[in-house]
Amino acid sequence: MYPAHLLVLLAVCVSLLGAASIPARPLNLYQFGNMIQCANHGRRPTRHYMDYGCYCGKGGSGTPVDELDRCCQTHDDCYGEAEKLPACNYMMSGPYYNTYSYECNDGELTCKDNNDECKAFICNCDRTAAICFARTPYNDANWNINTKTSC
């Protein structure tokens, strides 16, 4: 092998090792993030909603700290209802992995008619939450709070 080939091979291996350390993000959450950006016209990055209050982000418990946190609690509850649907009750079909069809036109979100029952339900959960986020004030003091003492 030529030295140039070895360098290319080494670069590919290093790239693959780096990519392997990136945690997988469920596709539906990627779509949800895009819906949030559509509804708020890109005014606030999606990551600001990932660790907000008691319910925005992974899990949730206690009393929501404000109206925005209530949007997240409602979204969590909606996903819980989706998981009970027979149509959403097979492998990789639940709310975190099932992708759906929707449109974003100038901040208006529409879940498309070609979604099956499960996809339509999940799309509506995400659409409702994204609209709620867009119309609700964001309080910087409620980002990255200590959920053990505040929730």
Curated annotation (Swiss-Prot):
Tissues expressing the protein: Expressed by the venom gland.
Domain of life per record: Eukaryota
Cofactor(s) the record lists: Ca(2+)
Disulfide bonds: 38-104, 54-151, 56-72, 71-132, 78-125, 88-118, 111-123
Family: Belongs to the phospholipase A2 family. Group I subfamily. D49 sub-subfamily.
Name this polypeptide is given: Acidic phospholipase A2 4
Catalytic activity: a 1,2-diacyl-sn-glycero-3-phosphocholine + H2O = a 1-acyl-sn-glycero-3-phosphocholine + a fatty acid + H(+)
Comment on bound cofactor: Binds 1 Ca(2+) ion.
SMART domains: PA2c
Gene Ontology CC entries for this record: extracellular region
Gene3D superfamilies the record matches: Phospholipase A2 domain
UniProt GO BP: arachidonate secretion; fatty acid biosynthetic process; lipid catabolic process; phospholipid metabolic process; positive regulation of fibroblast proliferation
Record: residues binding Ca(2+): 55, 57, 59, 76
Major place of residence: secreted
Pfam families from the UniProt entry: Phospholip_A2_1
Cellular localization per UniProt: Secreted
Native organism: Tropidechis carinatus (Australian rough-scaled snake)
Record: active site: 75, 126
Regions that span the bilayer: none
EC number: 3.1.1.4
Signal peptide per UniProt: 1-27
Purpose of the protein: PLA2 catalyzes the calcium-dependent hydrolysis of the 2-acyl groups in 3-sn-phosphoglycerides.
GO molecular function term, any single one: calcium ion binding
Record-linked InterPro entries: PLipase_A2 (IPR001211), PLipase_A2_Asp_AS (IPR033112), PLipase_A2_dom (IPR016090), PLipase_A2_dom_sf (IPR036444), PLipase_A2_His_AS (IPR033113)
Keywords: Calcium, Disulfide bond, Hydrolase, Lipid degradation, Lipid metabolism, Metal-binding, Secreted, Signal, Toxin
